[in-house]
Amino acid sequence: MDLIAQLACELNLKAANVEAAVKLIDEGNTIPFISRYRKEATGGMDDVALRALDERLSYLRNLEQRKEDVILLIDAQGKLTPELEQQIREATQLQRVEDLYKPYRKKRMTRAQKAREAGLEPLANMIIMQASAKGSALDAAAAYVNEEAGFDTPEKALAGAADIVAETVAEDPENVADLRAFTQNTADIVVEATDPAEKTPYEPYYSYDEPLRRIPNHRVLAIDRGEREGKLRVRVNVDGAAATARLGSRWPRRQGVFAPVFDAAIADGYKRLMAPSLEREARARLTVRAQTEAINVFAKNLEGLLSARPVRGARVLALDPGYRTGCKVAVMDETGKLLDHGVVYPTKPRHDVAGTKRELARLVKKDGVNTIVVGNGTASRETEEVVSEFIAEQAPGLRYTIVNEAGASVYSASELASQEYPDLDVTVRGAMSLGRRLQDPLAELVKIPPQSIGVGQYQHDLDQAELSRTLGHVVEDVVNRVGVDVNTASASLLGYVSGITPSVAKNIVAYREENGAFTDRRQLKKVPKLGPKAYLNAAGFLRISGGKNPLDATSVHPESYEVATSVLERAGVATSELSRGGVPDIEHRLGSISALASDLDCGTLTLIDIVNELKKPGRDPRDDAPEVVFSRSALSIDDLEPGMELKGTVRNVVDFGAFVDVGVHQDGLVHISKLANRFVKHPSDVVRVGDTVKVWVEKVDRDRKKISLTMVQGK
């Protein structure tokens, strides 16, 4: 197989660009580096396209290796024919290779194998070929009686030959492929309760069936979980008669004395040898499909969360609510440095509201706090009410917001947190994490395992290795899209930079602590274990503010400094201008970019990126994200009425809709049918985590604490 041609065809890309991308990947370059700094070679592929190519490349290479292995295994048995080898080599899917190998795979002794060893294969061939015979089928079988092997009567000999026919039919690759497609396209999934009287979350599935090809992914995952917990019984229902007839249609003229035997063998081959595995396979494919989509949804949600806009200039008082142990307080300056910490008790059992307000007033005045953050966990609603009252009574210029606590406890108790703040209590670390999530969500959330951030569906039921790999790619892509200040970034953040391993990230921090702040990107070459390849892949994503060269604070790669300097000269601008906000009118000064690219012997795509960066050096793409929604007064679910218009923040996106925080401590659901005034294939096509949206209350169930919202006015 020509891998380059195959990839180009499948992904609708130019072969030359595919070949260049594959070469760059094989040379050890990272996806973010190739996407950002090798656009001429790849034709401008973004990180999504490159990851798809890399994934498919791995699959096709594994496929080719498996083909070679299978060919060798069959050849070792002396059963490889030119036709079979050609079929294997032309296969484009691993499943097809395994289907072709199945008849030759070593397996435990089967009824058919036992019959073959007894010399009944010629009789089986007579059945398949519908050979003419004198007398009955039993008369023909009498010649193959083998008492020593246990086939001591014509009936047993004929049954043994039928077993060979059944296995031959069931293992034929074309039959398997055809019946697999038939099962996928026509079968139903049928679900029933193991105990219909028991109350469980799975009651909607107690008597449920739906075609395999139509069942939504979230239902598949719910049914899988219910089955795993022993609450549901699940089977795949296939029209066995139709499947058997379809199998038999390959031999349309079954006549003569062997016809009834052949018919029975085909039916047996399907029911006993094909149906169980095809039904298991159909369930497995359904689960893989659902899990793959769930991982993709999780990845999109995580990307939205990590790409949230930082709240710069915020001096934050963070409250991690609780009851018996009180609310933990952490006050941080604009850089996230801890200024104060303590505990207040606004909730039961102490319910010291007056004392809490006094302490808040003291800290706000002492530390110049302008923003309060409240975690959304236990006791959040009561804590928010006290904060709202405090602002109304004593600090009308103050603002507050609710922050998602998911993963904060995981971080605060982690080894990383104890290394960062060895002298602080776990509870203080947790409160600090909440405040820093507002100041710089990306820098704080990279310290937490992505699976713990809580923006997916059924994440604990998913393939954890695949989930971890996919989410790791998301974090890597966002970190490199934003860029990292090498003098302030934690080792956790640096570890996601292109070309930087976790151990090298720690070395960067150690070098910084020992030698002082980096003032030149070239100093990175002195960091232990940061070799030439790592420097090439990392340099453009590591920023140095206030260094010797203003270009070090931009996304311009050091390999392009000469071009960038020439561009500035053409524009009549000194490099020092970059430190004062860049050159907004640089495009007007330069004229034709394509002509300039030719003059400077630089690729047009690369030059466009350089010019855009010089226009606004160090621009943070997160500044395009929606602003954080702040409040000054608290709402509760009792305040909501149908028709009420609200502004909210998307907290989670799932297959069936989006959950929106409207400030009442219970996220409302916008069903997929109410996201837009048009057909929506998936909610992620309309919204993503972190979006600020306008919604209308449709229905409020106060007893069950459920809120139904719509994004379509008047719906």
Predicted features by range, described:
Residues 181-189, 319-323, 377-379, 403-410, ...:
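A glycine-rich phosphate-binding loop feature that marks nucleotide/adenosyl-phosphate handling sites
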Residues 281-299, 452-483, 597-642:
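Long, charged amphipathic helices and adjacent flexible linkers at domain junctions
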Residues 33, 49-52, 59-318, 322-423, ...:
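Duplex nucleic acid-engaging cores and interfaces of nucleic-acid transaction enzymes
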Residues 140-154, 207-211, 225, 235-237, ...:
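Low-complexity, acidic/Ser/Thr- and charged residue-rich accessory regions of DNA metabolism proteins
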Residues 30-31, 46-148, 340, 481-624, ...:
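Accessory alpha-helical DNA-binding modules that contact the DNA backbone or grooves
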Residues 96, 100, 401, 407, ...:
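Long, charge-rich intrinsically disordered scaffolds of nucleic-acid metabolism proteins
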Residues 12, 309-311, 476-510, 632-670, ...:
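C-terminal accessory/binding modules appended to enzymatic or scaffolding proteins
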